[in-house]
Amino acid sequence: MRVKDTLNLGKTKFPMRGNLPKREAEWEKNWEDQKFYERRLKLNEGHERFDLHDGPPFANGNIHMGHALNKITKDIIVRSKNMEGYYAPYVPGWDTHGLPIEQQLTKQGVDRKTMDRAAYRELCRKFAMEQVEKQRTDFKRLGVMGDWDHPYITLLPEFEAAEIRVFGKMYENGYIYQGKKPVYWSWSSESTLAEAEVEYHDVESPSIYISFPVKDGKGKLSEENTYFLIWTTTPWTIPSNQGIAVNPKFDYSVVEVGDRRYVVGTDRLSAVAEILGWDSYKTVQHLKGTDMEYMVAKHPYIEGRDSLLMEAVYVTDDDGTGLVHTASGFGEDDYNTAMRYGFDVLSPMDNKGCFTEEIPDPDLVGKFYTDTNEIVKDKLSAAGNLLHYSTFVHSAAHDWRTKKPVVYRATTQWFASISKFRDQILDQIEKTTFYPAWGKTRLYNMIKDRGDWVISRQRAWGVPLPIFYAEDGTAIVTHETIEHVADLFAKEGSNAWFTHPVEELLPEGFTSEHSPNGKFTKETDILDVWFDSGSSWSGVQALGRAVHYPTSMYLEGSDQYRGWFNSSLITSVATNGVAPYKSVLSQGFTLDGQGRKMSKSLGNTIAPNDVIKQMGAEIIRLWVASVDASGDVGVSMDILRQVSEGYRKIRNTFRYMLANTADFDPEKDRVAYKDLCKIDQYLEVKLNDLVAESIVNYDKYDFADVYKLVFKFITNDLSAFYLDFAKDVLYIEGKDSHARRSMQTVIYDAAVKLAKILAPILPHTMGEVWGYLKEKEEDVYLSNFPEIEDYADADDLKESWGEFMKLRDDVLKALEEARDQKLIGKSFEASVTVYPGEAAKAALDKLAGEDFREILIVSNLVMGQGEVPAEAKQFDQASVLVRRAEGEVCPRCRMYRTDLGADSRLPQLCGRCASIVAGDHPEILEEGLED
């Protein structure tokens, strides 16, 4: 037998390389075949629930890194909650109605205006379900576990029926009304938009200053050559002007410039004078805003049109002139002010953004609104009322789907009245927990400031508004009509609205005093898609999915404070008086490595599927766990490669632990904690602390700290310390020796506990690790998080070993200096004498019996007594003297020993190794030992 054959070298088939792109798919198939998701829930039946309600992604296109961040975070939470013992189901969902799907059909050459509506909607449904199937495959490939065979989908009949009932309950409670008021209007999609469907981009717009001649100053202001001065960025709205708003709290100045007088806000006067080039002007009069109410101006270029002066507190002195042009059909503030003063709404624009015959200037009829800016400018100039024209860049509202500008346009729509139950909503926000905490303020302020919700849309693909109209135009919505429509939708889906005549959509024998002839018509608009997803708390129940209400958590991107978090809260409070969630967790956006938004034009997008093919889903999952996603997070291939290095470190550490516990049977070889060597007890205590802190961080949804703690433990406590000196015990000591079994106990425990703690983050790899451990559960996901032990001596151990670690640092510094001086090469070439300080000596006394030489990986260690030699190095905890070790290298333990050949039967070995080999391999005493 050769010397190396006497060593207890670790062996394992656990591969060094994960080959993740190939093997992950195999593991995922096994999870599905073995029904691990269902079995985990079965284990937790009857336990406290944790329900994470999935915010439905839109079923259109390939998944992106934002999807990956979101879905993996949810999966980490659900897995960790299940491993804590909660009953934590996960039911994925999809949002399947809306304009993007219509746009995709248009790209395929489908013209909805030439088709039967029901047939067109069937094409939309088919396309949406194809997208669901594609995304379902991609999400599962990220390692996300859930009830993928029974998702909730907003186009499913039962879901649509539930949504109709939510609408009906809101109507019954008095929260739904029809009105004509300005809403965001997308001419590019020919539909209204909710606030959540609007995004902002920089555009270049006109900036013009216009004078309105005073017609009636009510005896307080001269009409002769006197003008009200306004500023606007929308010249196209000037023909529809109905009034001028002033702030009742502001002071105004009448200034003389040449032969004209202008009324300007006093605090804006100097800025306006500079812009208009008034080198000299004279203030001739002061007015209060209240003085000007009900004064009348002439339209700046349309004969016979007047403009009323009205009070409005929203007028600011941040920009402009302190007087604001008001057109009731093209602005929410304009509308509200005009209504207070008894105006009719003037909104002379069609669905495509072109002016209708209602416009007071007939030259503009049929023209696209922005094309009229130049015409209006020229007419103002000809009338002598254009004082200044320039352009400037500012942020303007755009349709989030088409990326085209939107306008405020007054149209007849259906609304949810937020004002009627705003206080209830705000009260529910106060009772909700937010991660991060600032989310509470953000959502609170959005609800506090938001106007009524326009819920009708002029599109084809969506859930129809379940409203009928009588012969006299009266809208009809009753409990009976809602239930009848909902029951029909539950059987046939919402396409029934378009395939059945109105008589079949109404309850049998339905009558109304408003239809003496029994004739009715049905609404053609559909519900806002945010009403779809905002009703998901109800739809998922109607589908019989395993999600309780109110649910434990909603988790989405921070844009959903104005989207899904918002709409879900409104529908739930409006119908049941409670928030649909107990907690809300929001995430930032995924940016590239330089902090830029990802876009195809910049070429900085990363597709999760491409990463999976190159590196594996585990690398994406580890990236998700490593970042603080409460804000925006960067991702690039370079960043993912760095994450991959971290993964490799984790994998190799597990491989070492598995190899060196391959001959360890925890049932018969385990050493009880009280009998462990003190250094092993210390590592058990450190491991226990790691488990406790990790579970706390899982409960705080702080996965970055879980990863940091685990990686630090693996890198510092295991690789750089414990496993570094472990070879001297694991390889050299007797196979069944107490020291070796003690250390194997700790290493095995570390492998088991770390696998459990990392399982929610790296389920593929930890499942692979689990297959090499001797645990009873079939998969790590079927086990629970480790129990937290109560070690009575934990504090004493940490204090004593903490002092030793400081001493160790001093010894390592001394060894490094000896290396620099060429005194030694490897640390085992050294003989070290330590003269400990008081704190270190006290710690060493408490740890008496430990082999510190072994821990320091030196050939000889002496605790010096008496006077410290002059050549010793002085450090914080001790003085250290390093000499080259005497003796010869033992070929087995690689230490310098002076007792080689002490056992004549094994002359090559030192006394320690000879004794061990004789005990483990007595046959060698007969056969002899080769080098």
UniProtKB/Swiss-Prot annotation:
Residues at which ATP binds: K600
Binding site for Zn(2+): C890, C893, C910, C913
Keywords of this entry: Aminoacyl-tRNA synthetase, ATP-binding, Cytoplasm, Ligase, Metal-binding, Nucleotide-binding, Protein biosynthesis, Zinc
Enzyme Commission number, as recorded: 6.1.1.5
Reported cofactor(s): Zn(2+)
Gene name of the record: ileS
PANTHER family named in the record: ISOLEUCINE--TRNA LIGASE, MITOCHONDRIAL, SOLEUCYL-TRNA SYNTHETASE
Segments traversing the membrane: none
Protein name (database record): Isoleucine--tRNA ligase
Recorded domain comment: IleRS has two distinct active sites: one for aminoacylation and one for editing. The misactivated valine is translocated from the active site to the editing site, which sterically excludes the correctly activated isoleucine. The single editing site contains two valyl binding pockets, one specific for each substrate (Val-AMP or Val-tRNA(Ile)).
Catalytic activities: tRNA(Ile) + L-isoleucine + ATP = L-isoleucyl-tRNA(Ile) + AMP + diphosphate
Cellular component GO terms held in the UniProt record: cytosol
UniProt remark on cofactor binding: Binds 1 zinc ion per subunit.
Origin species: Lactobacillus delbrueckii subsp. bulgaricus (strain ATCC 11842 / DSM 20081 / BCRC 10696 / JCM 1002 / NBRC 13953 / NCIMB 11778 / NCTC 12712 / WDCM 00102 / Lb 14)
Similarity field: Belongs to the class-I aminoacyl-tRNA synthetase family. IleS type 1 subfamily.
Motif segment ('HIGH' region): 57-67
Family annotation (InterPro entries): aa-tRNA-synth_I_CS (IPR001412), aa-tRNA-synth_Ia (IPR002300), Anticodon_Ile_BEm (IPR033708), Ile-tRNA-ligase (IPR002301), Ile-tRNA-ligase_type1 (IPR023585), Ile-tRNA_ligase (IPR050081), M/V/L/I-tRNA-synth_anticd-bd (IPR013155), Rossmann-like_a/b/a_fold (IPR014729)
Record-linked PROSITE patterns: AA_TRNA_LIGASE_I (PS00178)
